[in-house]
Amino acid sequence: YHYSDSQTELTPYPMKESINPDGTISPFMIHAKYAAGDIDGVPYSSKGLAPANGCQATQARNPVSYTGMITYMHKLGGHYCGTTSWDLFYRQLMMIIKYATTHSQSIMAGCTSYSNQNQNLVEETGVMRVVLTKAQAAGYVIGSYVSIGDVGSNTNKDRYYSYMHNKAYSVKVTKIEDVDDSNAAVYVDAPEAFDTTLTTWITTMPWHSGATDEVAGSDGSLNSNTNGKDPYKIQGIETCIGAYEVLGNVVMDIVTGPDGNPARDVYVCEDASTLSSNIATVRANYKKAIAQVAYTAASWKYI
């Protein structure tokens, strides 16, 4: 596998993931099929797992950050890493080659517009459901995943907090049924029944791995490619599952830019066994990108 930015280039560059640690070229390259899930404190790319994440639900609390993933991924071995820049580039390259666009959402939107949070309307005991208005319930996708929690007097509904998950964490929506002329119930496959109050909330969560396994072929989403609620796969790799994906081999260093504002230098690690959270080590041993991320006030900084 090679790529080139010129039609006349005679010596194409090998894809980085095809280069072995000793510098030789492998006859194949491997990309993880799924986002990592956690099994007994160890990350695995396996079917049927909630994506590893750092929310404070008892079932989660995984160290998913650039720094945290160094130790977390190395539990599998010194050359393991979270998603790399080359994993991401491969997906982008496949979109360019197969669909002739860099605007991936025009072809497959992924789970990018599915962030519902609704308050339960009816107190119940020993159930596996919440009751919402019919319009609210219609916004949920059967087969997708949600958490249910009693927030009490808390007003912050961020999924990070444990109280957003204290009734049921990342459980599947099994059915949606009308309960009267105005309301409908969203049922879940919680491990045990729970009580609901008027401070119980339901919130969407990322899809579990394997959500695209029933999609015929190598590309596409199960229900809709463009509804913004379904993850998709490209070249067999599942992606856009409804969560931020942290790159495990790239770090941004905050520096003073040419205009005096805080710009970002981008450093890329090309050997997972040398990953470091020490910025001096990063500057000395990582490869510095030519491009610098310019300052933008009060906004996310993207590479």
Predicted regions and their residues:
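Assembly/oligomerization scaffold segments
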Residues: 1-5
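Short, conserved beta-strand/loop elements in beta-sheet-dominated catalytic cores
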Residues: 79-88, 213-303
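Short aromatic-cysteine micro-motif
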Residues: 6-240
